[in-house]
Curated annotation (Swiss-Prot):
Protein name, as recorded: Bomanin Short 5
Cellular location(s): Secreted
Organism of this sequence: Drosophila melanogaster
Pfam family, one: DIM
Propeptide residue intervals: 19-23
Tissue spec. comment: Hemolymph.
Family to which this protein belongs: Belongs to the bomanin family.
Taxonomic lineage from the root: Eukaryota, Metazoa, Ecdysozoa, Arthropoda, Hexapoda
Length: 40
């Protein structure tokens, strides 16, 4: 099941890079304080 989470995270990152809703919502270093990304 670990690969499923990896694929999900990669897809989420690709979506965030392709069309960012808010610059503050993109997780870069894993330290996200004020973003509303599910699972992050």
């Amino acid at each position: 099941m670990k690969w499923m989470s990896l694929v999900f995270l990669c897809g989420l990152l690709a979506m965030a890079v392709a069309s960012p809703l808010n610059p503050g919502n993109v997780i870069i270093n894993g330290d996200c304080r004020h973003c509303n990304v599910r699972g992050g």
